[in-house]
């Protein structure tokens, strides 16, 4: 029984490493085939602060994109609010578990002016998510006021971006001064609530 549990745990961890199957061709080159309806994401690392990054104590780099409702989302426009930023993929099991609770968490802390944002970096085929992918995620998990955005691997440090990830999902807890206060790798419903309560107490 113990060996079966250990095998499943290792398999789950491997499934959600930052690399993904089918994301490269035989020459280890990204297969950047883009579907016609891929959602264009504007990723703007230019900021009004001296520098931005993805570590604790950093101002995050801005993310500007169209959310699942067709509204523009601008991370910096949420200055003064608390932000839970969840970088996920559609093919990752724990990411789906997190997605199933995103709206619930958003509703739970709505009175504290908290926003829970999901950025999907890849779809189930390890490709940039399309509008149809975003809408499928929203349909599956009931997002209404909790924004779901399409991202790309270009956002990640491994691809020349500024968001450092070593596992899926990765959560960034951002305070009212737009400073990253905590970074959590992987998903635990209890840990998400604990980190939010800690953020509220700052």
Question: Which residues does each predicted region cover?
Answer:
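Conserved helix-turn-beta segment immediately C-terminal to the redox Cys motif
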Residues: 81-82, 97-120, 139
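Short pre-active-site segment immediately N-terminal to redox-active cysteine/selenocysteine motifs
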Residues: 81-83, 88-91, 123, 167
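Ser/Thr-rich, Pro/Gly/Ala-heavy low-complexity intrinsically disordered linkers and tails
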Residues: 13-46
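Conserved redox-active cysteine motifs that mediate thiol-disulfide chemistry
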Residues: 87-104, 126
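Thiol-/selenol-based redox modules, centered on thioredoxin-like
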Residues: 167-202
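Sec-dependent bacterial lipoprotein signal peptides
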Residues: 1-14
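N-terminal "domain-start" segment that seeds a small globular fold
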Residues: 35-76, 145-148
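Short, internal strand/loop/helix patches
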Residues: 117, 132-170
